[in-house]
């Protein structure tokens, strides 16, 4: 493995996709909460930090919190031309999330579109077969799966080397790589709070007992 893309820094967009306004996708029961509570995209933030540690140009976008529409997200993606787009999913929003993936693939067809989250982890093959524009699914903890995938894409490597990845081959077959072991050294992960500071607006988030958590 290598720490940086060989020729130039590869762009990666990590997206909490647009759905209902203020949809809190990262909480235990994803929903629009009457109190207005909306959680930070913590899992995407960890993956963003890991990518940055490895030398990639990672951009974390939280569309529901920031109020970004799908056209706004497509404009952002068009401007950055990422090689990898990581899209968070949830069961209530999965059809919408796949629609967003399809729209992004139409905007930047060269991008590898990867779905992450509990729903696609539980149903990787069914999720891939929802739409041919979805290139892959990261199963389980995806912090290092996303990093390893970015490294393989940047270096023209073999997707078979990426643990925890399910992906579609050129002929449409679905391949499930071996599972990735759970992360043992959690202290090696970057602080999510620093990722929030670099990429998000604290005023976009709310927790009823702490205002801006």
Language-model features: locations:
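Acidic, low-complexity intrinsically disordered segments
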Residues: 2, 7-213
């Amino acid at each position: 493995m290598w720490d940086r893309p060989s020729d130039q820094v590869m762009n990666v967009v990590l997206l909490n996709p647009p759905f209902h306004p203020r949809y809190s996708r990262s909480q235990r029961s994803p929903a629009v909460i009457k109190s207005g509570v909306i959680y930070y995209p913590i899992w995407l933030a960890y993956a963003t930090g890991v990518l940055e540690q490895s030398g990639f140009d990672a951009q974390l976008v939280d569309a529901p919190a920031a109020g970004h529409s799908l056209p706004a997200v497509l404009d952002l993606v068009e401007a950055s031309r990422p090689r990898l787009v990581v899209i968070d999913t949830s069961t209530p929003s999965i059809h919408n999330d796949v629609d967003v993936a399809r729209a992004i693939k139409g905007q930047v067809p060269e991008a590898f579109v990867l779905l992450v989250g509990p729903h696609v982890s539980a149903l990787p093959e069914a999720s891939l077969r929802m739409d041919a524009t979805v290139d892959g699914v990261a199963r389980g903890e995806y912090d290092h799966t996303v990093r390893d995938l970015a490294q393989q894409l940047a270096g023209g490597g073999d997707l078979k080397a990426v643990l925890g990845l399910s992906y579609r081959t050129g002929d449409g077959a679905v391949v499930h790589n071996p599972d990735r072991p759970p992360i043992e050294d959690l202290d090696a992960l970057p602080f999510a709070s620093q990722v929030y500071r670099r990429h998000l607006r604290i005023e976009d988030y709310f927790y009823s007992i702490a205002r801006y958590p």
